[in-house]
Amino acid sequence: MIRSLPTMTVLIPLVSLAGLLYSASVEEGFPEGCTSASSLCFYSLLLPVTVPVYVFFHLWTWMGLKLFRHN
């Protein structure tokens, strides 16, 4: 069953934030060791930032197309 768009819009950033908080609590050198692209910590910071931004701009584009079509 496919979830509705408003549910996914809220669910994806919350799951990303939970992953960020989990990695912050588990990783010992969380802020210091996240500079190298080869570390797992780098990607645990990158995904929670990238996913909500992608969802926001995808919805922004979709709303722009809807508003443009109705004007």
Curated annotation (Swiss-Prot):
Pathway: Glycolipid biosynthesis; glycosylphosphatidylinositol-anchor biosynthesis. Its main location: endoplasmic reticulum. Signal peptide: none annotated. InterPro entries: PIG-Y. Residues 27-44 are lumenal. The chain crosses the membrane at residues 6-26, 45-65. It comes from the Eukaryota. One of its GO terms (cellular component) is endoplasmic reticulum membrane. Coiled coil: none annotated. It is found in: Endoplasmic reticulum membrane. It is a multi-pass membrane protein. Keywords: Endoplasmic reticulum, GPI-anchor biosynthesis, Membrane, Transmembrane, Transmembrane helix. Residues 1-5, 66-71 are cytoplasmic. GO terms for biological process: GPI anchor biosynthetic process. Component of the glycosylphosphatidylinositol-N-acetylglucosaminyltransferase (GPI-GnT) complex composed at least by PIGA, PIGC, PIGH, PIGP, PIGQ, PIGY and DPM2. Interacts directly with PIGA; this interaction regulates glycosylphosphatidylinositol-N-acetylglucosaminyltransferase activity. Does not interact with Ras proteins. PANTHER family: PHOSPHATIDYLINOSITOL N-ACETYLGLUCOSAMINYLTRANSFERASE SUBUNIT Y. Part of the glycosylphosphatidylinositol-N-acetylglucosaminyltransferase (GPI-GnT) complex that catalyzes the transfer of N-acetylglucosamine from UDP-N-acetylglucosamine to phosphatidylinositol and participates in the first step of GPI biosynthesis. May act by regulating the catalytic subunit PIGA. This is Phosphatidylinositol N-acetylglucosaminyltransferase subunit Y.
